[in-house]
Amino acid sequence: MAKLDAYFGEYGGQYVPQILVPALEQLEQAFIDAQEDPDFRSEFMTLLQEYAGRPTALTLCRNLTKGTKTKLYLKREDLLHGGAHKTNQVLGQALLAKRMGKDEIIAETGAGQHGVATALACALLGLKCRVYMGAKDVERQSPNVFRMKLMGAEVIPVHSGSATLKDACNEALRDWSATYETAHYLLGTAAGPHPFPTIVREFQRMIGEETKMQILAREGRLPDAVIACVGGGSNAIGMFADFIEEESVKLIGVEPAGKGIDTDQHGAPLKHGKTGIFFGMKAPLMQDEHGQIEESYSVSAGLDFPSVGPQHAHLNAIGRAEYGAVTDDEALDAFKILARNEGIIPALESSHALAYALQLAQAEPEKEQLLVVNLSGRGDKDIFTVHDILKEKGEI
């Protein structure tokens, strides 16, 4: 039986209760078989094209970098059906679940984007769907909760712990431990126990593949850097995967600095965490001196995660990718700048990557550089949050 690597350097692995090991082994084998089956690939690609709307556009920002010699392109995952990159890998995993003969799907969600993507895939493919969501996030993201319910999903609020994403993750895994014979756990990011980080990367890698083809067609060369926000890290690894071997291309991930890296209110475990075991994997983790998981914080619910995918941890450790951090305020500024100058309202998550790109352009205005930002999602879900913040600041 062929096996995928369970580790990326020292990170990754499969730290789960023994009861889940057979389910993960079955999933790994089903994924390997599916990848070698042209019918599976064909069905997946057809859904991506005809249902989700791939390939997504690569848009040159005409106004954003005026006064500098930077050319900035956006990879428009915000245009995907469902409103974010999440739809890509959810369709892949839902097809995989059907292939394994499972008709129930369990998912966790923070901002609600993964929950919405899971609900739409289940509606399309005739699967039962239950989504665990921190009770705080249920309040913060009511439009997405209603969207999930409209598409037939059961949304289960989680009140334990901090009532946010990490608690929803724990509840979803607990559910799967009892139901894995009939249910598939559709994990929402490139993290968690092996083989999930690899599966999610492979079902997201078309982001980078398309970007490479599109930028070569437009500019005749590869970009100097590709930039993506990092929570768990699926949109970033989808963008990075096809560029890892291209040494001339910088890979830049952007973590949420929240209210400041020097405060305890951020979500930047890669640069400011310690290695630990969480959510079935060994990875950098926000923890206190006793090893207890600390609360992460970000204005964007989708980046509010106390750990990070193991491949990002490895790319950081070997120096192949670099990881910066952007505060809430910097992300909000980028959100407003893109809306006012290009007529595109980005997700707050994606605004972190955009803010970093704008800082690069402004730091060296005379430098000719070609940058691509993965605009991982659209900002419809965030307009009420942004409205309230701007009102509080007296800006509206």
Curated annotation (Swiss-Prot):
Q: Which residues form a coiled coil?
A: none
Q: Which cofactors are required for activity?
A: pyridoxal 5'-phosphate
GO terms of molecular function: tryptophan synthase activity
Pathway per the UniProt entry: Amino-acid biosynthesis; L-tryptophan biosynthesis; L-tryptophan from chorismate: step 5/5
Query: What Pfam family does this protein match (any one)?
Result: PALP
Q: What class of enzyme is it?
A: lyase
Give residues where N6-(pyridoxal phosphate)lysine occurs. 86
For this record, an example GO cellular component is: cytoplasm
Catalytic activity as recorded in UniProt: (1S,2R)-1-C-(indol-3-yl)glycerol 3-phosphate + L-serine = D-glyceraldehyde 3-phosphate + L-tryptophan + H2O
Record flagged with keyword Disulfide bond:
no
**Keyword vocabulary terms for this entry:** Amino-acid biosynthesis, Aromatic amino acid biosynthesis, Lyase, Pyridoxal phosphate, Tryptophan biosynthesis
The cross-references to InterPro entries, in alphabetical order and at most eight, read:
Trp_synth_b_CS, Trp_synth_beta, Trp_synth_beta/beta-like, TrpB-like_PALP, TrpB-like_PALP_sf
Which EC number(s) does UniProt give? 4.2.1.20
- What quaternary structure, including any partners, is listed in this protein's UniProt entry? Tetramer of two alpha and two beta chains.
As for family, the record states:
Belongs to the TrpB family.
Briefly, what is this protein's role?
A: The beta subunit is responsible for the synthesis of L-tryptophan from indole and L-serine.
Protein known as? Tryptophan synthase beta chain
